[in-house]
Amino acid sequence: MCGIVGMVAGRDVSGLLLEGLRRLEYRGYDSAGIAVVGSDCALRLLRCEGRVQSLCALLGQSPLCGTMGIAHTRWATHGKPCAANAHPHCSESVAIVHNGIVENHRSLREMLVTRGYFFHSQTDSEVLAHLLHWELRYTAHLLLAVKKVLTQVRGTYGLLCMDAASPGRLIAARSGSPLAVGLGCGENFVTSDPLALAHVTQRFLYLEEGDIADVHRDSVCVHDAQGNVVARPVVTYQMQLCTQDKGTHRHHMHQEIWQQPHAIRHTLNAYMSFSSSSRAQVRTFGEDRVLDGTSCKTFERLFRRITRVRIIACGTSYHAGLVARYWFEAFAGVGCQVEIASEYRYRTSVVHAREIVLTISQSGETADTIAALRLAKTQGYLCAIAICNGARSTLVRESDAVLLTHAGSEIGVASTKSFTTQLVCLLVLTRMIAQAKKILTQEPEDALSAALQRLPQDVEHVLECEADVARCARHFVHAQHALFLGRGELYPIAIESALKLKEISYIHAEAYAAGELKHGPLALVDAQMPVVAIAPASPGVLFEKMASNIEEVRARGGMLYIFTDVPERFGPVCTPEADAPEGACSQIVTVPSVSPLTAPIFYAVPLQLLAYHIALLKGTDIDQPRNLAKSVTVE
C-alpha cells in the first residue's frame, strides 16, 4: 500500500527520492510528498494529491535540495486523498512518514490539542509528528525521543523520522509494517520495498518486529524490541533496473498475462525435473527451508504424517487456496479447509491433530495473512508453510518452510502470473504429500507429470486466442453487472475471474457454482445480464451438468459467453466475429483441450484477458485501479 523512501547522503537526495517513489507507484497510492533537510538545516516540504509525476512538476517549480530526506506515497485510510493528508507530516523541525494505523489516534490528538498543537490533516499519522516534537522538548536525542513516542502508540507502523536539528540522521521503526535499510558507501537508505532503491543499492538488512534503526551516512545501528543492539543479516538483492519497462505492451497487466508461460516454466523447473519419458521427480525441501532441489528427509516424514491442511490467505491468493482444496483431497487424501485471513484471526478455530497451516501471499507482506500466521503458530499446527513471491518478505522469514512462486516482478495491481504460479506450487505440494504418503499410483502420477510438463506450452497456445476474447469484450463492455459460472475446480476460477473484472473494469460481478443457479442467481438473468460459463470437456458427469446449466441461462435470454474446448456442444452459436444482437445466441471462445489436472491454471488465462480487454474498452486505469493497492499492508 503506502510506500516509504528515505536517504541520508553526501549528495543531493531529492531526485533519488523521487525515483524511489516512481518505483513504488505499482503498489497503488492517491497522493505523494517529499521533505528534505539542506545544508542550512532547514526543513522543506512538498506534497500533492495524485501521481508522482505531479510531485515532480511541483519540484520543478520549487526545487528542493538537501542531503537528507524522506518521501512517501499514500493510500488513504484516515482522511480523504488531498495534499493536506499526504505525507510527510511535519511539526516544526520534525518530519515523519508512516505506513500502518495508529489505533489510539483520537485520544492522542485530544491530548496534543490541549498541549497547544494544531492539526492540519485528518490523518492518524500526524499525531506521530507532534508527539515526536513534544518529546524532543525534553531530550535532544532523536532515538530516545522516538522510543518514548512508540510507548504511547497502539497500532501498526513502519515509521521513518527525521529532525532538521539532527542533520545526517534518520530513525526507522517497525511494528507490523515492513521496513528495510539499504546500505551504500558513505550513504544509507530506508524503504518499505527494496525495489524503490534498486537504482542506488542492492544490499539490504531487514528490520524485524519491534526493531528501531538509527541510520547515519556511515553507520547503521539496529535495536531490537528489548532495546539490545543487534546485527541483522545483510543480504544482496539482485533487482533489474528495467523492471517497470512494459516493452511492446500497453499495460503491465497485459505484459504479465503474456509472461505466464515463462513464469510457470520457471516455477516448475525450480521444483521438478522432467525426464524424456515425461515422468517427473519432485524436489524437496532444502536446508534453507525453501524447495530448492535438495532432498530433506525431515519434510518427507512430516508429509507422511499430515492428515489435514489449513490454507489461510486473502483475495486472489484465497481463490488459489480454494482450487487447491480439490487437489489436496482428491490426490493427497488429506482434508483441506480454506480460510480468509481477516476472518480466521477473529474466530475460534479447532486445530486437528497432524494438521499443517499453509499461507499464500503474492507480496508476503499482507497484514492479515501475517497476523493469521502468527496466531496459527501458537495453536499447535505441525508446521507452517508459505507460498509467496517475495523471497525476503515477512511471511517467508516467519514460516517454517517456503515455496517461492518465481513469478518475477508483478507491477499491475491485479494479480495474474502470481495467481497461476501459486496454483503451480500448490499442485506441486499436493504431489509431494501424495508421494510421501504413497497414495498416487503410477498411472495418475504419470498423468500429472505429463500435464505439468505440457502446461507452459498449453498456456502459450491459449494466449493465441486473445483476438477472440477481445471481440467478445465488445459485446460485454456496456454491461452493469455480470455472472460467472463454474463447477468443480473451475468454480474458484469463476470467483477469481469475477474479481478480476471488478478490479479493473469496475463492473459488478458475482460468481456461483453452476449448480446453485436455481437457488437464487437465475432471478438475475435477462437479456442485459452477461453470463460467463467455464465449460471444458471433462470426465464424469460434470460437463453434462454444466451444459444443462448453460441451457437454463439460454432459456431465460441471458447473454452467454462460453469458454470451452468443445464448441460444437453449445449451439446455436455466434462466433466472436459476429455482431449478433445481445442475448440472441451464445458467444463462444474456443480454447485448446488440456488435461483436467491443470485446467484451473489454463482457464484462468483467457478470463484474465477478458477482464483486461473490457477494461481497455472502458478506459479505466488498468495497472492502478481506483482505491486498490498491490500490497495490503494494513488491516
UniProtKB/Swiss-Prot annotation:
UniProt enzyme class: transferase
InterPro entries on file: GATase_2_dom, GFAT, GFAT_N, GlmS/AgaS_SIS, GlmS/FrlB_SIS, Ntn_hydrolases_N, SIS_dom, SIS_dom_sf
Main location: cytoplasm
Molecular function (Gene Ontology), one example: carbohydrate derivative binding
Biological-process GO terms, alphabetical: carbohydrate metabolic process; fructose 6-phosphate metabolic process; protein N-linked glycosylation; UDP-N-acetylglucosamine metabolic process
Ranges for domain Glutamine amidotransferase type-2: 2-218
Domain SIS intervals: 299-439, 472-625
Catalytic reaction equation(s): D-fructose 6-phosphate + L-glutamine = D-glucosamine 6-phosphate + L-glutamate
PROSITE patterns from the UniProt entry: GATASE_TYPE_2 (PS51278), SIS (PS51464)
Localization, UniProt: Cytoplasm
The UniProt record lists the keyword Methyltransferase: no
Keyword list, A-Z: Aminotransferase, Cytoplasm, Glutamine amidotransferase, Repeat, Transferase
This enzyme's EC code(s): 2.6.1.16
GO cellular component, one term: cytosol
Active site (catalytic residues): C2, K630
UniProt key word Repeat: yes
Subunit comment: Homodimer.
Job description of the protein: Catalyzes the first step in hexosamine metabolism, converting fructose-6P into glucosamine-6P using glutamine as a nitrogen source.
HAMAP family: GlmS (MF_00164)
Protein name: Glutamine--fructose-6-phosphate aminotransferase [isomerizing]
Native source organism of the sequence: Treponema pallidum (strain Nichols)
Name of encoding gene: glmS
